[in-house]
Amino acid sequence: MQLHDHMKYIDLGCKMACIPRYQWKGRPTERQFYASEQRIVFLLGTICQIFQITGVLIYWYCNGRLATETGTFVAQLSEMCSSFCLTFVGFCNVYAISTNRNQIETLLEELHQIYPRYRKNHYRCQHYFDMAMTIMRIEFLFYMILYVYYNSAPLWVLLWEHLHEEYDLSFKTQTNTWFPWKVHGSALGFGMAVLSITVGSFVGVGFSIVTQNLICLLTFQLKLHYDGISSQLVSLDCRRPGAHKELSILIAHHSRILQLGDQVNDIMNFVFGSSLVGATIAICMSSVSIMLLDLASAFKYASGLVAFVLYNFVICYMGTEVTLASGKVLPAAFYNNWYEGDLVYRRMLLILMMRATKPYMWKTYKLAPVSITTYMATLKFSYQMFTCVRSLK
């Protein structure tokens, strides 16, 4: 088992995002040809995302802000904010993954080089492989179901209105977006509007899958190495010949894992920040939209609410898992039989213990930690915003 065995769902996400899959020195598969059709779909999807972000704001400026009743104004504002955040966070993933592609491939190459090949009894490779693949599979299926539901909802609503004569055809797209052509009352215009949002969300969801699965993969790789270091420290006997060399190797390996964690933090900083801000606003505004809008719109924004809750939770959960895994090194070093070693051995172990005193933690631009505590604070603040906005009705 090697690192490339973990790449199944990341490769599927890359295929959906219409970008080449990640390749590094040592990966057995050759780089696949990046077809011009994929480039066209990627560029078209990115343009559609940018247009949708702009169109949502223009639609609200031309229509939503003109509402005379407070309840209608709040509903239009919440609908605009939730749609804007959904598209904006997706575009942030496109930007972060595209601009950091070389750094990601370099990081994957380093992880490939240090992937356990010897002394496998200290590394639970199969355990962490199964956990990572299970989570990535669930995420992939969830985003695919969400994508199909989100983009098919306008067609189902239109079909329902067509079959029931008491309803007028609303021609409502996935989001309230301004288009430079006629949408309401035009089958062609409506189809083009739905298709443009569908293409944009196709690329956006693909990048979201890549982002989430990359964070999952990198998290469990760090956990694997922290767990391996802890296991080797517990089993290390200072009386055994060569113990000093083994300990020095573990100290160097621990230092390298900390550096790799910093690289992950630097690469994903923009993702962490956009998810924190976007999820806080979107969870609040989606909840308001569910409360104030009609049933069909409520179901649509409920799916967006669930997506943001899960999206932010996965990121914060992975950050907590890295912190907990790094915290195992200190007790493992302490329970080593250091008291039977010589002075040099004790000093070396003390250096490792001092370095591992504070568990490693990802931070969003060195400010908010990426943890479940931050996730709960996000939900709390979103609820406070929700009660404030809800009271305006």
From Swiss-Prot:
Disulfide bonds: none annotated. PANTHER family: ODORANT RECEPTOR, ODORANT RECEPTOR 13A-RELATED. It is found in: Cell membrane. GO terms for molecular function: odorant binding; olfactory receptor activity. It comes from Drosophila melanogaster. Interacts with Orco. Complexes exist early in the endomembrane system in olfactory sensory neurons (OSNs), coupling these complexes to the conserved ciliary trafficking pathway. The keyword Hydrolase does not apply. It holds the Pfam family 7tm_6. The atypical heteromeric and topological design of the odorant receptors appears to be an insect-specific solution for odor recognition, making the OR/Orco complex an attractive target for the development of highly selective insect repellents to disrupt olfactory-mediated host-seeking behaviors of insect disease vectors. Odor-evoked OR currents are independent of known G-protein-coupled second messenger pathways. Keywords: Cell membrane, Membrane, Olfaction, Receptor, Sensory transduction, Transducer, Transmembrane, Transmembrane helix. InterPro entries: 7tm6_olfct_rcpt. Expressed in olfactory sensory neurons in the antenna. GO terms for biological process: detection of chemical stimulus involved in sensory perception of smell; signal transduction. This is Putative odorant receptor 69a, isoform A. The gene is Or69a. Odorant receptor which mediates acceptance or avoidance behavior, depending on its substrates. The odorant receptor repertoire encodes a large collection of odor stimuli that vary widely in identity, intensity, and duration. May form a complex with Orco to form odorant-sensing units, providing sensitive and prolonged odorant signaling and calcium permeability. It is a multi-pass membrane protein. Residues 1-39, 98-139, 211-269, 326-365 are cytoplasmic.
